[in-house]
Amino acid sequence: MIEWKDDNDIYGRMLVLTNNPLFNNLRNAVDNHDADLSDALSWGQLKSKRWLVTELESLDISLGTVFLCAGWYATLAAMLFQSKCNIDKIRSFDIDESCLQIADTINRNQVKEDWKFKSITQDIMDIDYNKHKWQIWSNTNNRMSYPITDMPDTIINTSCEHIENFDEWYAKIPSGKLVILQSNNFFDVDEHVNCVEDCTQFRITAPMTTQLYVGELELPKYKRFMLIGYK
């Protein structure tokens, strides 16, 4: 573990500078869960997520209960909680079980706040986007938790380029839900199985009854596209 006096402890130094507990949470994710945050905190990832948060703040709409799909380490959740956005709670779903403890650690303050944030290991194809029931393993009680039911108002997916059966997934979202989507045109990455050429193609693949925002962000190697609206 890096000592607080060590100048290599960037998270510790930022905590002292800003008094923002998020930096301590990031530090704990690295120290206690061996989290590699180099990609999650890359300029491309952070600029894309900051763009999303900024546009939501400009729209000034209530997000209510948020389902963050393919949420990874839920750095976006941390940014949303620190924003001006009106949020009741966030549930972050990812099929990779290694994400759970890291995401919960990064958002530890909201986890402790009656689970205002909670990460769940689950395939986003298996979620009921109308009224979803979920459980997690409780180490404290050595058993599964009692079932919890959440009804999402907002569905966010910033990893649409990774969703192989995107049409099938999108069809699961009920009409009227607020949807925030990001994809890109970075076709060179093998894991990017659902890239789009531009915003026009993206809008065709994800039709909405009311579009609140359509835009693109120029990044060094690719363009990222974003749609915000009601399905």
Question: What function would you assign to each model-found segment?
Answer:
Residues 61-75:
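Conserved class I S-adenosyl-L-methionine
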Residues 88-95:
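Conserved SAM-binding motif I beta-strand of class I
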Residues 164-231:
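C-terminal substrate-binding/active-site "lid" region of AdoMet-derived donor-dependent transferases
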Residues 1-64, 101-154:
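S-adenosyl-L-methionine
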Residues 98:
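Conserved Rossmann-like nucleotide-cofactor binding loop
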Residues 64, 152-153, 177:
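Conserved acidic residues
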Residues 73-87:
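Conserved SAM-binding loop of SAM-dependent methyltransferases across substrates and taxa
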